[in-house]
Amino acid sequence: MYKQIIDKYYVGCDALRHILLTHSQSVTQRALQIASLHPELHIDVDFVEQAAMLHDIGIIRVDAPGIECYGTEPYIRHGVCGAEMLRSEGLPERYARVCERHTGAGLTLDDIVSQDLPLPHHDLQPETIEEKLICYADKFYSKTHLDREKTIEQAERSLAKFGGDTWARFRMMKELFEPEK
C-alpha cells in the first residue's frame, strides 16, 4: 500500500524519492527489529511496516533544499503535511497520527505554543505503542546522512532543539523499547 502512495506523490523527483525511501526503510527496519524483541507489547507489525514507510511522506511539501525538498511549508510541518496527505487518500486515521506525532519525541501543546511553532494548537505526542515505536526508531536516522545510524547519544543531542521535556520523553521510549541490561 505505501508504495502506491509514494509513487503518486514522488514523481519526477528522483533524488528526494531516494532520500525518502532510504530513510524510511532504515526506520522501518529498526522498528520491526525492536518489535520482534517485544512480543509482550503486542505491536501490530504489519501496520508498523506500512506506517513507518509513510511517516515522512509530507517532506515533499516542505522547503528544505538540503534534502531536495522544494515545497513551501516550514520543515517542522512535514508531519502535519503528511497527515493531511494520508487523510486525503482515505487511509485510516492511525496512519495520519504517526505522521503528525513523530516530530522530536512528540510535541506537547505547551511546546508548540511556547516556541511559537507553525503547528496546530493541540498535543502531538505519540500515544499508541506503534506511534511511539516509529517515533523512537526515526530518531536514529537523518535524511542528510543516509548511510549513518546515530548512537543513542547522537539521537539525544539531535532532540535538544525541541526543548521542553523532549529528552525525557525520548528516554522513556528508550526504556520501553531498548532498556539497559
Positions of the model-derived regions?
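Alpha-helix C-capping/helix-to-loop hinge sites
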Residues: 9-16, 34, 140-143
